[in-house]
Curated annotation (Swiss-Prot):
This is Alpha-neurotoxin NTX-1. Expressed by the venom gland. Belongs to the three-finger toxin family. Short-chain subfamily. Type I alpha-neurotoxin sub-subfamily. Keywords: Acetylcholine receptor inhibiting toxin, Disulfide bond, Ion channel impairing toxin, Neurotoxin, Postsynaptic neurotoxin, Secreted, Signal, Toxin. GO terms for cellular component: extracellular region. The lineage of its organism: Eukaryota, Metazoa, Chordata, Craniata, Vertebrata.
Length: 83
């Protein structure tokens, strides 16, 4: 009986994937690609892009922030989906 309960507990933990952390790219513009683990149960990655006096700019990270007019943002929900 104990073995069955232990097996059910392990299966539950594996199925629920307790402790899962979303991983997002966090490099800016044309920097070497890097990733970060998102904190606080964050469920989105974002890629924000705009043009300024320095040229075309890109920012990546965790979350899905609000942006001003003229800034394009793409939000997604899977690991490293914001490249």
């Amino acid at each position: 009986m104990k073995t069955l309960l232990l097996t059910l507990l392990v299966v539950t933990i594996v199925c629920l994937d307790l402790g899962y952390t979303l991983e997002c790219h966090n490099q800016q513009s044309s920097e070497t690609p890097t990733t970060t683990g998102c904190s606080g149960g964050e469920t989105n990655c974002y890629k924000k892009s705009w043009r300024d006096h320095r040229g075309y700019r890109i920012e990546r990270g965790c979350g899905c922030p609000s942006v001003k007019k003229g800034i394009e943002i793409n939000c997604c929900t899977t690991d490293r989906c914001n490249n």
